[in-house]
């Protein structure tokens, strides 16, 4: 997947909700063969900057905040936020 066509998962190292999403993300990848790139934003200014770059779409999906877990589709520019189901993750990835 090209650099501008990624499925991105913004997470925080100590984020309980992010840890709970890991099995869903792994199941998504196993079932679809699509990779979700995880970017940890609480301890990486570089990754946090990437997240801020997509801030408008993420804030819209997250009720006005840049929270984690958040998922951004670089191809469609769509975001989903929080604890999402496998079905919602698949729909987001398809656009």
Where are these regions (language model features)?
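Non-catalytic, surface beta->alpha helical segment in thiol-disulfide oxidoreductase systems
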Residues: 67-95
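A short beta-strand-turn-helix
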Residues: 1-7
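Structural micro-motif
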Residues: 55-72
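Thiol-based oxidoreductase modules, predominantly thioredoxin-like and allied folds used
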Residues: 10, 33-52
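Typically the conserved alpha-helix immediately C-terminal to a functionally engaged Cys/Sec
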Residues: 19-32
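Cys/His/Pro-rich metal-binding microdomains
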Residues: 16-19, 72
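Aromatic-flanked redox-active Cys/Sec active sites in thiol-based oxidoreductases
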Residues: 9-15
């Amino acid at each position: 997947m090209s650099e501008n066509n990624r499925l991105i998962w913004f997470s925080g190292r100590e984020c309980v909700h992010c840890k709970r999403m890991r099995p869903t993300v792994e199941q998504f990848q196993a079932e679809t063969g699509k990779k979700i790139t995880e970017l940890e934003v609480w301890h990486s200014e570089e990754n946090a900057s990437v997240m801020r770059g997509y801030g408008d779409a993420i804030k819209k999906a997250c009720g006005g905040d840049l929270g984690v877990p958040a998922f951004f589709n670089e191809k469609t520019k769509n975001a989903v936020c929080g604890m999402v189901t496998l079905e919602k993750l698949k729909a987001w990835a398809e656009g």
